Every structure is written in C-alpha cells, then in structure tokens.
C-alpha cells in the first residue's frame, strides 16, 4: 500500500532539489521562448492525478481494456471541448506531441516517397515540415519554400513550386514567422495541383481559439497543434478538422491508434480537457489579445533601438531579431541574456551566414510573460533591457543592472500567486 503522506523531498531529495530549483528559475527569470508558457494549477492537478495509472487503448466506448468508464468521460470532455474551441467536427486528442500529430497526418494521407511542400526551417518553418534531419524529410520528397527579402511568405513562389513539383500535400504553418498567413491562398495553391492542405498551427492555436489570428479551419483538410504554447495546456498534441470526409476521419483515427501509438496518456488528456475549458472562458480572449499587444510593443521598441525584426514587425506572439552583420551571434546573445535572467532561444534568420548551432538571430515570444500579467509598459521596459544587453553583451555591469531590474519585475508578477 502506498502512503499518501510520503514526500518527494524525503524519498528522493536529489530529484526534489532539481524540481524546486526549476520552479525557482521559472519564478525568477523572465521567459521569452515563444514555444513556452505556464499552465494553470488546475491543469497540473489533472496531469498529476491517478489517471496516469489507467491503460486505455482505443477510443471512448471502444477500448481494448476494461475499467475505462471514467477515463472515457475525461477523453470525451477533451474531444467535445476542443471541437467547440476550434469549431471543428473532428478531433483526436491522443497524440503525445505536436510532432507525433504531424507524423500521423503524413502517414495517414501519404505514401513514402510522395512529395510534400513545406516551409523551410531556415526561413521559419518547423523540423517536421520536411527538414532533412527529420523523418518528414527522410520518408518523403520534401520541397521547401521560404520568405522574400521583406521576410514575408512569397505566395507566387509557393504556387510556382507547387506547379513544378505537384506535391501530394502542401504544409502551412511555422515556428518562427511573425505575420498572418493567408490560409485561403494556400488552399487555392493546394487545390490547383490536387494536393491536401495540412496546417500546423502549433504556435498560434491559442490566438486562433480567441479569434485574434485567422483560423485555418475553413480552408485546411486537416489541422494539428500542440496543446501548450499559446493554448496554455499540458505538453501534447491534437488533430482537428472541419468538413473532413468520413474516410479521412477513419484514416486519422486508425493511424494514431493503432498506427503509431499504443495506450494514450489519460492523465495528460484530462489535463488537456481542463486547458480546453479554460480556452472557452472570456478571459482567454483578453489574454490572447494582450499577448499580441505585448509582442508588438516589444518589436516596436527593439526597432526603435536599432534592431531589425524579420518582416518588419509582428502580428502574432513572436518576433525574430535579425543580427546579421553584428558582432554578437544568436548563441552569444542567448548566453548574455541568460546571465541577466532573460530566457530566449537563438534562432536562424533568413539567409543566415552562421551555422544553426550559432545563428544570427533571436526568437522572442510573449505568451509566458502575458500569463504573468505583463502589459505594454512592462514589455517596453523588457525590450529596452534586451537591447541594453545586446548593445554590451560582455559588460558585467550592464548584465548585473538588467538582472536586478528583471528580478524586481518578476517579483511584481509571480507566475503562481
């Protein structure tokens, strides 16, 4: 019998110390990695529940194990809620991650060797959109599109590549693109060559849910997302669709299970259900609106300080700082900002002369700081501190001054109050 009174710090002090230190880091450092956010205590309560003990291969009402009545309720809540969030008529909440959701879509609709047309990782796409290092670039013939000199998707070039290569699937979505995407234009391009349009909205799902960013649901054959990032849930994936044929839905269902996964993570699915309920609250829309306001305030401030933002600004939650031609690399900037308790990630920018391990750019995002309660004035202060560090990345006095300012700001806006 397990005791309910045993504590991790007593049983495993080494691990408990690491967890406590990470909790402290999250409170004391400002988080600007665009793909990170903080989930609520309610989400964490569900994810830490006894549902982790239950195996439930299959889907609600059609399990291969007994004793699934209550986890069926949890999964059906998640399905029903995410359909409501995105106005979808199909949803699968079992993918363990966004990458696995993407893999499921590819394997459900394509054959090895088929051609896909996706956004280049070097221009803002994602590994799973056909990068050579990823299975999507190994199993399939991946053709890549990018951005023009203004940092914008060149739809004429996408059309040209589609006409030339006749892909079976066009992939739209990004991990580092700060403007709105014309989903209707992408669908027209896909239709012109008889291809599926697959949208990966992992980064912008929360913005889409709140009506702050255009929804791809009316245009894509199938859509995937992570459930963290702007959606502010546990780490995981989903597949959704609107107007999908019964045949397409069956393909998606069967490829997730039994195709690429076995038992679903019922504790994570329960946590997803909580996050989806939160996404239906009026406060969620207000939050997403503020995410964009904060991002625009930061971008405009950095531009005023002489830093180039790829595409000239942002219409979503993120921005790419282009430092080509500057002495400081993305890697060095990330390290310097880290010393000042500002957490970012180095990122390649279009036509980057440096290696992917060094880069000439930084990706900044505002979902996490907005969860803390930051508004535009706080974001402007933060952007100025970032510029101070980038102007003098090896000046210990500057780093110390910014670190003190960040610490004071974080204390004003605790993650978990």
Swiss-Prot record:
Q: Which GO terms describe its cellular component?
A: cytosol
Q: Where in the cell is it found?
A: Cytoplasm
Q: What Gene Ontology molecular function terms does this protein carry?
A: glycine hydroxymethyltransferase activity; pyridoxal phosphate binding
Disulfide bridge positions per record: none
The UniProt annotation places (6S)-5,6,7,8-tetrahydrofolate binding at 121, 125-127, 355-357
Q: Which reaction does it catalyse?
A: (6R)-5,10-methylene-5,6,7,8-tetrahydrofolate + glycine + H2O = (6S)-5,6,7,8-tetrahydrofolate + L-serine
Listed EC numbers = 2.1.2.1
InterPro entries xref list: PyrdxlP-dep_Trfase, PyrdxlP-dep_Trfase_major, PyrdxlP-dep_Trfase_small, Ser_HO-MeTrfase, Ser_HO-MeTrfase-like, Ser_HO-MeTrfase_PLP_BS, SHMT-like_dom
Q: Which GO terms describe its biological process?
A: glycine biosynthetic process from serine; tetrahydrofolate interconversion
Stored PROSITE patterns: SHMT
Oligomeric state and interaction partners are given as: Homodimer.
Its family remark reads: Belongs to the SHMT family.
Kindly provide the name given to this protein in its UniProt entry.
Serine hydroxymethyltransferase
Organism the protein comes from: Xanthomonas oryzae pv. oryzae (strain KACC10331 / KXO85)
The organism's taxonomic lineage, starting at the top: Bacteria, Pseudomonadati, Pseudomonadota, Gammaproteobacteria, Lysobacterales
């Amino acid at each position: 019998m397990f005791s309910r009174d045993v504590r991790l710090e007593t049983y495993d002090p080494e691990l408990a110390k690491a967890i406590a230190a990470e909790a402290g880091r999250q409170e004391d450092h400002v988080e600007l990695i665009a793909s990170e956010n903080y989930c609520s205590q309610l989400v964490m309560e569900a994810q830490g529940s006894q549902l982790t003990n239950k195996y439930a291969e299959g889907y609600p009402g059609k399990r291969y194990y007994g004793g699934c009545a209550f986890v069926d309720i949890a999964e059906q809540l998640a399905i029903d809620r995410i359909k409501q969030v995105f106005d979808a008529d199909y949803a699968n909440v079992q993918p363990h991650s966004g990458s696995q959701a993407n893999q499921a879509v590819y394997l459900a609709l394509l054959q090895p060797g088929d051609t896909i047309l996706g956004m280049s990782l070097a221009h803002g796409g994602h590994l799973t959109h056909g990068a050579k290092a990823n299975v999507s670039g190994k199993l399939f013939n991946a053709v890549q599109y990018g951005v023009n000199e203004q940092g914008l998707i060149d739809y004429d070039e996408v059309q040209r590549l589609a006409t030339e290569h006749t892909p079976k699937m066009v992939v739209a979505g990004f991990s580092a693109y700060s403007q709105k995407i014309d989903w209707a234009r992408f669908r027209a391009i896909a239709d012109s060559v008889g291809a599926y349009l697959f949208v990966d909205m992992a980064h912008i799902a929360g913005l889409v849910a709140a009506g702050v960013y255009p929804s791809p649901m009316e245009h894509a054959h199938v859509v995937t997302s992570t459930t963290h990032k702007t959606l502010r849930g546990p780490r995981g994936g989903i597949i959704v669709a609107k107007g999908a044929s019964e045949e397409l839905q069956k393909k998606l269902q069967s490829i997730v299970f039994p195709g690429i996964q076995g038992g679903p993570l019922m504790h994570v699915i329960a946590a997803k259900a909580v996050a989806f309920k939160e996404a239906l609250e009026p406060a969620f829309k207000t939050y997403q609106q503020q995410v964009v306001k904060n991002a625009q305030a930061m971008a405009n401030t950095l531009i005023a300080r002489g830093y180039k933002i790829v595409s000239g600004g942002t219409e979503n939650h993120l921005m790419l700082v282009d430092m080509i031609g500057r002495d400081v690399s993305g890697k060095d900037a990330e390290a310097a900002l880290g010393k000042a308790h500002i957490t970012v990630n180095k990122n390649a920018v279009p036509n980057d002369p440096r290696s992917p391990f060094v880069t000439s750019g930084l990706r900044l995002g505002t979902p996490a700081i907005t969860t803390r309660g930051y508004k535009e004035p706080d974001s402007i202060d933060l952007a100025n501190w970032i510029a101070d560090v980038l102007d003098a990345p090896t000046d210990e006095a500057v780093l110390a001054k910014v670190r003190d300012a960040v610490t004071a700001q974080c204390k004003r806006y605790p993650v978990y109050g």
